[in-house]
Amino acid sequence: MPSVIVVGGQWGDEGKGSIVAYLSLHDEPEIIARGGVGTNAGHSVVINGKKYAVRQIPTGFMQTKARLLIGAGVLVDPEVFFHELEQLKDFNVKDRVGIDYRCAIIEEKHKQLDRTNGYLHGKIGTTGSGCGPANADRVMRKAKQAKDVKELEPYLTDVAQEINDALDEGSLVLVEGTQGFGLSLYYGTYPYVTSKDVTASSVAADVGIGPTRVDEVIVVFKSFPTRVGAGPFPTEMPMEEADRLGLVEYGTVTGRRRRVGWFDFEMARYSARINGATMLAVTMLDKYDKEAFGVTDYDKLPRKAKEFIEEIEERVGVPVGLIKTGPELEHIIDRRDTI
């Protein structure tokens, strides 16, 4: 069985969480792991009308047979971690989650610095979660590791070993990235970026998967890309236009209103190329065409929506295998068997 990596193709908030949640329930992976930066990314999913938002634990938590892992490359905030354990107690997360003992720790001093530093919080528009300062300490070899926090001892493991053992046994491993290509420290709109690279290759390294062991890379795009905070946004639309179209969203972590733009085909093609996309997922198609809401059969999509998907495939050069048509888990078109 393969390893599958899911990453964002825009500026985050593409709906990676909903894609990971669907794959978790439909494909039943034995392991669901989180790579990426840390608690500055909030992934949300709607289950039976109830919205769950997580910043630390993998979004596939509702797959109660899966082992949930947080890779060594991810920053861990113990306060957020234990809050989510309590929040998700109905899903028996506590007995299934593991943290790599090498994860760096976000401390209160990191959060305070992130929130009070005029450059980070004011100009760059960081989330204030402490990830940037914590990663800076990690680079300087000053950060604490998960193995140094007594309260985390029951959850410590070697994530890389667990994942590679699972792959050796033919198990399916699903890996969830954070943020999006436009926020990559290397390839994004520097300096308005996050504190590390978040492309598929880095997400694989975060959890200990070597390049030759990556089987599939799914890059997620939202029909109307959004961005929180400062930074270039070439296809941004006026807020009045976003209001008129009903495209009003707020960040999961910051609560700040998201800036909205038109789909950027040039960026999407470059993002898919650098990430090595084998397949695309498109979310919120119902926002592009309201008549697409809740459709689960590709052949039943209205013409406007179908032409948009076909244009993405043609201009990006990668097939679209998953299409979200609404907020609920079942609001999805799965074309993977036909592309």
UniProtKB/Swiss-Prot annotation:
Classification via CDD domains: AdSS (cd03108)
Positions of IMP binding: D13, E14, G15, K16, N40, A41, G42, H43, T127, R141, Q179, T194, R256
Cofactor remark: Binds 1 Mg(2+) ion per subunit.
Taxonomy, superkingdom: Archaea
Entry's Gene Ontology molecular function annotations: adenylosuccinate synthase activity; GTP binding; magnesium ion binding
GO biological process terms on file: 'de novo' AMP biosynthetic process; IMP metabolic process
Residue positions binding Mg(2+): D13, G42
Record bears the keyword Magnesium: yes
Binding annotation for substrate: T252, V253, T254, G255, R256, R257, R258
GO CC term, one of those recorded: cytoplasm
Residues forming the catalytic site: D13, H43
UniProt: GTP binding residues: 12-18, 42-44, 258, 284-286, 324-326
Localization per record: Cytoplasm
Keywords assigned: Cytoplasm, GTP-binding, Ligase, Magnesium, Metal-binding, Nucleotide-binding, Purine biosynthesis
Catalytic activity as recorded in UniProt: IMP + L-aspartate + GTP = N(6)-(1,2-dicarboxyethyl)-AMP + GDP + phosphate + 2 H(+)
EC number: 6.3.4.4
Subunit description: Homodimer.
Function: Plays an important role in the de novo pathway of purine nucleotide biosynthesis. Catalyzes the first committed step in the biosynthesis of AMP from IMP.
Matches recorded under PANTHER family: ADENYLOSUCCINATE SYNTHETASE (PTHR11846:SF0)
Name the UniProt record assigns to this protein: Adenylosuccinate synthetase
Phylogenetic classification of the source organism: Archaea, Methanobacteriati, Methanobacteriota, Thermococci, Thermococcales
